[in-house]
């Protein structure tokens, strides 16, 4: 029979844990509102910016004279994977889903004889990938001291990536992140950013504009900003996804703690009842002996 004192201590311990998970759920809910607003506010700008770039790119075509960020290096031998995860855990499968997608992509490329390099953003992704892919690591971006992600953070990451591209360190760059859909749904996403790959259709009005000095010159100026914009959008999507996943995980943890408290309380009451029954039997047996 379980010790009553041990059961009582376990109940108090689970109650204490439930208070913590409930508090974390409430904090995540408050942060989620801000993060979701930021992610949703960035989407129209990002989509429009990409549409303009896509229109310009369509005008340039596959000309070899186009910017390298658009036409590429002429090879796809070396791939840079920018894996964006959280600095903290306790957010369900948020980090593992991104790491799983990046790992599968890296293994596929290696099987094809490609060279893979990995730049991690966020501690948790680095921890999950280092066991199998540490030899491919070339850098890490620490955002643990950043309370709210800004465009400057994205611009710094973009500058690092672009610097490596200009130095000839890779041919293709892909970012990995979670796209926010809802509190209970975040979609692991792989998005190529170099050479430029635009989502959606090109700007339908692009052919109505005359560009000076030329489409190539304008693209050469806008494409680096496009890389930073896509990275910033990914960081915002990741931020909203992280808080949504943490809120959901802490809600589940709080519910599970409540269920455990209920089970332990029933077990405690049954054990206490058994102790009282045994004591009564002993008293009655003693009285009969007299």
Swiss-Prot record:
Keywords: ATP synthesis, Cell inner membrane, Cell membrane, CF(1), Hydrogen ion transport, Ion transport, Membrane, Transport. One of its GO terms (biological process) is proton motive force-driven plasma membrane ATP synthesis. HAMAP family: ATP_synth_gamma_bact (MF_00815). SUPFAM superfamilies: ATP synthase (F1-ATPase), gamma subunit (SSF52943). It is a peripheral membrane protein. NCBIfam families: ATPsyn_F1gamma, PRK05621.1-4. Belongs to the ATPase gamma chain family. It is found in: Cell inner membrane. CDD domains: F1-ATPase_gamma. Signal peptide: none annotated. F-type ATPases have 2 components, CF(1) - the catalytic core - and CF(0) - the membrane proton channel. CF(1) has five subunits: alpha(3), beta(3), gamma(1), delta(1), epsilon(1). CF(0) has three main subunits: a, b and c. Produces ATP from ADP in the presence of a proton gradient across the membrane. The gamma chain is believed to be important in regulating ATPase activity and the flow of protons through the CF(0) complex. The gene is atpG. It comes from the Bacteria. One of its GO terms (molecular function) is ATP binding. This is ATP synthase gamma chain.
């Amino acid at each position: 029979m379980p010790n009553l004192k041990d059961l009582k201590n376990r109940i108090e311990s689970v109650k204490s844990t439930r208070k913590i998970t409930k508090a974390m759920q409430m904090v995540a809910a408050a942060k989620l509102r801000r993060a979701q607003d930021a992610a949703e506010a960035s989407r129209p700008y990002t989509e429009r910016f990409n549409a303009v770039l896509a229109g310009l790119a369509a005008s340039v075509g596959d000309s070899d004279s186009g910017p390298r960020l658009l036409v590429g290096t002429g090879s796809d031998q070396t791939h840079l994977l920018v894996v964006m995860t959280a600095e903290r855990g306790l957010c369900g499968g948020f980090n593992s889903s991104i790491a799983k997608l990046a790992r599968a992509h890296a293994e596929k490329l290696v099987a094809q004889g490609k060279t893979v390099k990995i730049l991690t953003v966020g501690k948790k992704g680095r921890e999950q990938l280092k066991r199998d892919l540490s030899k491919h690591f070339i850098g890490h971006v620490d955002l643990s001291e950043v309370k709210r992600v800004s465009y400057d953070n994205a611009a710094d990451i973009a500058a690092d990536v672009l610097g490596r591209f200009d130095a000839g360190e890779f041919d293709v760059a892909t970012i990995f992140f979670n796209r926010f859909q809802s509190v209970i749904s975040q979609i692991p996403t792989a998005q190529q950013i170099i050479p430029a790959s635009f989502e959606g259709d090109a700007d339908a009005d692009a052919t109505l504009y005359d560009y000076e000095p030329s489409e190539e010159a304008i693209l050469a100026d806008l494409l680096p900003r496009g890389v930073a914009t896509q990275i910033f959008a990914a960081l915002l999507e990741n931020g909203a996804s992280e808080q949504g996943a943490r809120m959901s995980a802490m809600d589940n943890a709080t519910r599970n703690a409540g269920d455990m408290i209920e089970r332990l309380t029933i077990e405690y009451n049954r054990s206490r009842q058994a102790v009282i029954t045994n004591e009564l039997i002993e008293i009655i047996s003693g009285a009969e002996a007299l």
